[in-house]
Design a protein with these regions (language model features):
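Extracellular jelly-roll beta-sandwich "head" domains, especially the C-terminal globular C1q domain
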Residues: 2-7, 11-16, 24-173
Length: 173
């Protein structure tokens, strides 16, 4: 049996670190594509159509575009995406009316395919229903992914906690 002892694995030509192993044995992959985006607004609003999450907490590899709200897969692989949002009645961010439905869709713009959907119907009192979902999707390099909202709106305000979109590469196919 052989033992390979390394602390860092780098690209031979450019010295780009692909992986490190820390003193506790944890594997770190600093070049793995990931993003965490949110909607930064000046006040309460309701949004529909393609949602532009215009600010990021992290964007490793810069594959998420905060101007368009779109993520472009840099490589073919399995990706996990997460969406957090609440339904809203209108562009003013009002609570969704009773007996009303709203949905948010993870959409592959390149293949014109709906990949996942969060759906809510308000039964009874007016409220802000949860539209959150998580999905693992196989993507090809250069697939463009976005969140679309239909039927009504999603709620956003001046905080960065109500409307979130994130994703990361799990592994290559």
């Amino acid at each position: 049996m052989s033992t390979l002892k390394v602390g860092t694995i780098q690209d031979h030509a450019n010295s780009i670190t692909a992986m490190t192993i820390d003193s506790s044995g944890r594997i770190l992959t600093p070049a793995r594509p990931l993003f965490s985006a949110y909607r930064d607004s000046s006040g309460v609003e309701g949004l529909t159509g393609t949602i532009v999450f215009n600010a990021t907490r992290s964007n490793v590899g810069s594959h998420y575009n905060a101007s368009t709200g779109k993520f472009t897969a840099p490589v073919t692989g399995n990706y996990q995406f997460n969406f957090v949002g609440m339904g809203s009645e209108n562009s003013s961010g009002a609570a969704l009316a009773a007996s009303t439905a709203v949905y948010a869709t993870l959409y592959n713009e390149t293949t014109s395919t709906n990949l996942a959907r969060g759906y809510a119907v308000v039964n009874g009192q007016t409220s802000y229903p949860n539209l959150s979902f998580s999905s693992i999707q196989p993507l090809s390099a250069n697939d463009v992914i976005r969140i679309d909202v239909g039927s009504r709106y999603v709620y956003s305000d001046g905080s960065d906690i109500w409307l979130l979109f994130s994703g990361h590469l799990i592994g290559y196919l």
